[in-house]
């Protein structure tokens, strides 16, 4: 939790309680259903929660916005973002039912009211949203092809509607076909920890 407060000092008391509760909840659920590698669970706040919140370094979702988290796994980046933006609606989708169950149980346990869940493949989701977020789900070209149908034409945020991905490593080749619509933000500009040296937020206007 100290790590989160280092970078997000203005969290409300409710948000602090919700973030603080995540550790024990994920420890418990991860012992039953593996959604985070066993060796990485100790790094929950750095590698998963803070990483998810990297998206907030490029956008502050406005009240009433809608966001789909595609391939949410155990709830990342959707659950941390839903805590940070309580007036934004988040829809978390994953093709693996047991992972959706973990995310649902965690969200219910901390009292999140602005999240919905669906066990489905990306191709099956027909609703539209202001943004789609994801964390290293698949190559950019494949992801854009799948989610183009899910981006609403109605604009209400400072950034035009589109796709926001958390990715790592060398991405120039992957982003090349979309270079005129893509911007990359290096998270090592915001977060000091070694983990973020190669981590990026990739934004693509759709």
Swiss-Prot record:
Matching entries from SUPFAM superfamilies are given as:
S-adenosyl-L-methionine-dependent methyltransferases (SSF53335)
Q: Name the domain of life.
A: Bacteria
Q: Which UniProt keywords apply?
A: Cytoplasm, Methyltransferase, rRNA processing, S-adenosyl-L-methionine, Transferase
- EC number from the UniProt entry: 2.1.1.-
Q: What is a single molecular function from GO for this protein? A: rRNA (guanine-N7-)-methyltransferase activity
The answer on whether this UniProt entry bears the keyword Transferase reads yes
| GO CC entries | cytosol
Q: Name one Pfam family in it.
A: GidB
Positions binding S-adenosyl-L-methionine in this chain are 71, 76, 122-123, 135
EC class (word): transferase
Q: What Gene3D superfamilies has UniProt attached to this entry?
A: Vaccinia Virus protein VP39
List the subcellular locations.
Cytoplasm
The main place the protein resides is cytoplasm
Keyword Cell membrane attached: no
* Stored CDD domains: AdoMet_MTases
InterPro entries named in the record: rRNA_ssu_MeTfrase_G, SAM-dependent_MTases_sf
Q: Record's PANTHER family?
A: S-ADENOSYL-L-METHIONINE-DEPENDENT METHYLTRANSFERASES SUPERFAMILY PROTEIN
Regarding protein family, the annotation reads: Belongs to the methyltransferase superfamily. RNA methyltransferase RsmG family.
Q: Which NCBIfam families match?
A: rsmG_gidB (TIGR00138)
Q: Tell me, in a sentence or two, what this protein's role is.
A: Specifically methylates the N7 position of a guanine in 16S rRNA.
Protein name per Swiss-Prot or TrEMBL: Ribosomal RNA small subunit methyltransferase G
């Amino acid at each position: 939790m100290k790590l989160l407060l280092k970078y997000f000092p203005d969290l409300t008391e409710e948000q602090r309680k919700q973030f603080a509760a995540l550790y024990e909840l994920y420890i418990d659920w991860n012992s039953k259903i593996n959604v985070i590698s066993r060796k990485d669970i100790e790094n929950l706040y750095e590698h998963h929660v803070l990483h998810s919140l990297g998206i907030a370094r490029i956008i502050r979702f406005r009240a009433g916005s809608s966001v789909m988290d595609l391939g949410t796994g155990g709830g990342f980046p959707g659950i941390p973002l839903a805590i940070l933006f309580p007036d934004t609606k988040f829809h978390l989708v994953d093709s693996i039912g047991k992972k959706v169950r973990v995310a649902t149980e965690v969200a219910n346990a901390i009292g999140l009211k602005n999240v919905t869940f669906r066990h489905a493949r990306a191709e099956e989701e027909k609703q539209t949203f202001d943004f789609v977020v994801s964390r290293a789900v698949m190559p950019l070209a494949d992801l854009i092809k799948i989610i183009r149908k899910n981006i609403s034409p109605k604009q209400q945020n400072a950034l035009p509607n589109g796709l926001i991905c958390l990715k790592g490593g060398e991405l120039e080749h992957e982003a090349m076909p979309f270079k005129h619509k893509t911007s990359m933000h290096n998270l090592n500009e915001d977060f000091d920890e070694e983990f973020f040296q190669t981590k990026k937020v990739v934004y693509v206007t759709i």
